[in-house]
Amino acid sequence: MSSNSVVYWGTGRRKTSVARVRLVPGNGTITINGRPGDNYLNYNPAYIAAVKAPLETLGLSTEYDVLVNVHGGGLTGQSGAIKQGAARALCELSADNRKPLKTEGHLSRDPRAKERRKYGLKKARKAPQFSKR
């Protein structure tokens, strides 16, 4: 990465994961926490596809390198956070990118998270075994 190249930033969140995504003009390599993207995501095709989805929606998958710093949660949450962060960075790149990314759902925050445990129950909704007598 040269010192005068333009860098586009985006932050994504999913479950308890937070991803800070940088887009740099390049050849399409994905680096997550200093490791190659497919290696970091355990070569799981669903996770890799989720990370690449915003770039492929706009046809820019070979024009920008994706540099990611992500923490918290597991691979599902992290790949979702990276997807949202990359989409936000692409919106920063050009305002015209917003509409196709929004229609594909890459910009919306997934609100699903682990439900808290309630007192009197074993888990969030699992009650102790009922005994009639």
Swiss-Prot record:
Cellular component, GO, one term: cytosolic small ribosomal subunit
GO biological process, one term: translation
UniProt entry tagged with the keyword Ribosomal protein: yes
GO MF annotations, alphabetized: RNA binding; structural constituent of ribosome
Sequence segments annotated as region (Disordered): 98-133
Biased composition annotated in UniProt, kind: Basic residues: 114-133
PROSITE patterns: RIBOSOMAL_S9 (PS00360)
Residues annotated as signal peptide: none
Amino acid composition bias (Basic and acidic residues), ranges on this chain: 98-113
Regions crossing the membrane: none
Pfam families according to UniProt: Ribosomal_S9 (PF00380)
Keywords: Ribonucleoprotein, Ribosomal protein
InterPro entries per the UniProt record, alphabetical: Ribosomal_Su5_D2-typ_SF, Ribosomal_uS9, Ribosomal_uS9_bac/plastid, Ribosomal_uS9_CS, Ribsml_uS5_D2-typ_fold_subgr
Ribosomal protein as UniProt keyword: yes
Annotated family: Belongs to the universal ribosomal protein uS9 family.
Name of the protein in its database record: Small ribosomal subunit protein uS9
